[in-house]
Amino acid sequence: MRHFIVLLILLCCLDGYSQKVAIRLNTLPAIDGAFGGGISYAIGNQSTIELAGSLRPWKRSEMYVNRYWLIQPEYKYWTCQKFNGFFWGAYLNGAQFNIGGKRLPFGVFSRLKERRYEGWLVGGGISGGYHWMLNDHWNIETALGVGYDFIRYKQYNCVRECAGLRNKGRHHYVGPSKASISLVYLF
């Protein structure tokens, strides 16, 4: 009987880990043939930290180059409880890219169609989103973020990898810098 009481006391003292860790698959990078996902950890009843990223290691043809990696740590404050409802966040991002021969939506970086850019970026911003609970483990989350990115790049005359260097430059970008529609699994 004494062993049972000691075991019961020990079990009551253990911290429960239900719904503290989540893994996510961001479906938006998949549209472009990239892998996107991340892991989140609850650090309180209304706070989580996340490490997300995206990777596209290949190109499609000589006239179309689109290789990059992105890493994006984020802090999220949930208005109700973690992994449920609305949240606000602050994030950092870093990336390396080699892209050209591509037309982006809304006329953003319109010169990408004729030229190739190779370089890196660092920045950060603020985000907001919503998390829908489907059941105890599966959820869907959407998020949008705006921020600042410092971009350092080399611009090449055309899309081909053998193209001559046109110039080097820097760009200060302010605008949308995060978008996600994620399938989330809670442990």
Where are these regions (language model features)?
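Boundary of Sec targeting at the N-terminus
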Residues: 18-19
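Gram-negative (and chloroplast) outer-membrane scaffold detector with strong preference
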Residues: 41-142, 180-185
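Predominantly the C-terminal beta-signal and adjacent terminal strand-loop region
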Residues: 135-187
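Sec-dependent N-terminal signal peptides
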Residues: 3-14
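Short strand-turn segments of transmembrane beta-barrel domains in outer membranes
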Residues: 22-30
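Short secondary-structure capping/turn segments at boundaries of alpha-helices and beta-strands
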Residues: 24, 36-38, 76
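Short, surface-exposed coil-to-beta transition loops
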Residues: 33-36, 125
